[in-house]
Regions:
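Long, terminal "pre-/pro-" and other extracytoplasmic accessory regions
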Residues: 30, 59, 109-126
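Gly/Pro-enriched, hydrophobic low-complexity segments
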Residues: 80-84, 101-104, 124-222
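N-terminal mature ectodomain segment of secretory-pathway/periplasmic proteins
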Residues: 3-77
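Solvent-exposed coil/turn segments that connect beta secondary-structure elements
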Residues: 27, 44-46, 54-56, 69-70, ...
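Acidic/charged, solvent-exposed loop-and-adjacent secondary-structure segments enriched in E/D, K/R, S/T
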Residues: 75-105
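Short structured motifs
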Residues: 6-9, 36-37, 113-119, 172-175, ...
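A short, sequence-level motif marking secondary-structure junctions
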Residues: 41-45, 67-68, 86-90, 175-178, ...
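A short, amphipathic edge element
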Residues: 4, 34, 104-116, 166-171
Length: 227
């Protein structure tokens, strides 16, 4: 049988990569209407990420650059670059249920959390482990999380994300699992901000995705924001 460490490592291997390039759609279900925002993302490890919004027209050309714990956003409307840091990285992106960190961070759980197995459960005819993860370091967006991990896919099909106090901040789930470059990976993530009473959730739908792609360092230069 797999040890807790084996499970976490397998999950990290599926979800993380040295780098990735992806196009994605964010579908934000508001109270009255639904918005769809398309973007292209370049991510290297945990420290470098660049996002460019492609549509709708109002958001097109907006860009985000993340270097470590710092984030810069560029808005073509104002032609200004603004720096965001610290707790602001936990704020909502474009009114969605996702934060900058949810979208742009690629950090292995193994490094960040101590895990313990709470049991097993069958969901929709598939076996899952239930695992509790507690932060090893301060300052994480989600100091505690509980994950339901599919025993075949080795992916957290459902997660509850908690504050240090134990308050439920968000729920996340994934579906549309398929093999991408030899790994199981979801086609869709669903995030729900549990602190927003009226939230109907945000879908993050993967388009084309390339893992371990070569991304030139110049992609992460601040000058790119205005180009």
């Amino acid at each position: 049988d797999m040890s807790v460490q084996d499970i976490i490592k397998a999950m990290d291997d599926n979800l993380n990569a040295k780098s990735r390039i992806l196009t994605s759609k964010m579908v934000v279900h508001g109270r009255r209407s639904t918005r769809t925002i398309e973007s292209q993302n370049w991510i290297v490890g945990t420290d470098y990420a660049f996002t460019e919004y492609l549509s709708p027209p109002r958001e097109a050309g907006t860009k985000m650059l993340k270097l470590g714990a710092k984030l810069w956003t560029y808005s073509p409307q104002t032609d200004r670059v603004i720096q965001i840091s610290g707790h602001m990285l936990r704020q909502s992106v474009m009114g969605s249920d996702m934060s900058c960190n949810d979208m742009m961070e690629d950090r292995p759980l193994m490094e960040l959390y101590d895990a313990k197995l709470e049991g097993s459960v069958e969901i929709d005819g598939r076996d899952h482990w239930i695992m509790l993860l507690e932060a090893k370091e301060k300052g994480l967006s989600y100091p505690k999380r509980r994950a339901w991990i599919d025993k075949e896919y080795l992916l957290p099909m459902k997660e509850e994300l908690y504050a240090k106090s134990g308050k439920l901040l968000k729920t996340a789930s994934m579906d549309g699992i398929k093999k991408v470059q030899g790994r199981w990976f979801p086609t869709r993530f669903i995030f729900k901000d549990e602190l927003k009473r009226n939230s109907k959730g945000t879908e993050w739908i993967m388009g084309e995705i390339q893992f371990d792609a070569d991304i030139p360092e110049s992609r992460f230069e601040k000058g790119r924001l205005r180009k």
